Swiss-Prot record:
In muscle, parvalbumin is thought to be involved in relaxation after contraction. It binds two calcium ions. The keyword Cytoplasm does not apply. One of its GO terms (molecular function) is calcium ion binding. Ca(2+) 2 binds at residues 91, 93, 95, 97, 102. Pfam families: EF-hand_7 (PF13499). This is Parvalbumin alpha. Disulfide bonds: none annotated. GO terms for cellular component: cytoplasm. AB domain, comprising of helices A and B, is involved in structural stabilization, protecting the hydrophobic core of the protein. It is required for high-affinity binding of Ca(2+) and for Mg(2+)-binding. The gene is PVALB. It comes from Macaca fuscata fuscata.
Amino acid sequence: MSMTDLLNAEDIKKAVGAFSAIDSFDHKKFFQMVGLKKKSADDVKKVFHILDKDKSGFIEEDELGFILKGFSPDARDLSAKETKTLMAAGDKDGDGKIGVDEFSTLVAES
């Protein structure tokens, strides 16, 4: 399954373009722009599993840096600052990684 099976390709392209500048990434705006906020809980979980590249059941900090590439292969990597900000927002239990429920909460709070 690919991201465009779940989200509109044009919305993804616009959202990735909107955050092309380093240190401009805002996960709340990004999730809204790609249409993730409007998706069912099931679809949000499917997106999580696409982003969980190593299939560990968590998005670790190293995977988080590549989150935009999970939506579009030609997107940029997040900066260290953006990655840490996103991890702080999503890692509710402080274990250094984002689980599927934490990701769902992160999207819902967007």
